[in-house]
Amino acid sequence: VYIMSGKQNHQYHLVEPSPWPAVGSASGFTLVLGAAMYMHEYPYSAFILIAGFLMLFATMFFWWRDVVREAEYQGHHSPIVQIGMRYGMMLFIASEVMFFVAFFWAFFDASLYPDTGVWPPEDVQVFDPFDLPLINTMILLLSGCTVTWSHHALQHDNRKDFLLGLFLTILLGISFTALQAYEYSHAAFGFTDGIYASTFYMATGFHGAHVIIGTIFLIVCLIRGCVGHFKAEKHLG
């Protein structure tokens, strides 16, 4: 609500009309369509898949640009708006939990009551859990430590350790992705080689995608931190 002087008498951010939700939806549709066509070996499917990726990255870039401008330069992220962002993140994490519960449900449904009477299937050569999977697990745990260190450093206005922690976390995220790509390239089974392979690639693949997206988020935060964004008392948005 606005008073006659044109000044707003509330702390809510009335967002200006934006094309990015619609463009993002179109990007996601193009990406999924291209991926499905690529898996079924349709002609020109690779171009559609690449176009979907490019559209999605462009949407992320321009949408983040708008959010940064609203937070850093226009001052729209009031305490009330920040509370809304926190609630939004909580709901997002809850939806992510349900997302991965579905994959674990599929895995345990197949593993606890296997049709062949044995799990994993006898013809599947599985990974040694104490080899690369253990290394990647340790990398993830270490990345959680470094990003927490970075956050606490920022809260104490220690920008050097804040940026160093972010940089190390990004390196760990890239290392995890590289090792998972190496693991996939040396796997003895493909995505269509039965229920074990399907649930393995579905769960670990989406998890890897989350690591990649999170690494991109942290790279953006590192760039913003290098140009002076984020303060000890205000670093949300």
Q: Each PLM stretch: what is its role?
A:
Residues 1-237:
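...captures the hydrophobic TM-helix bundle architecture rather than a specific catalytic motif
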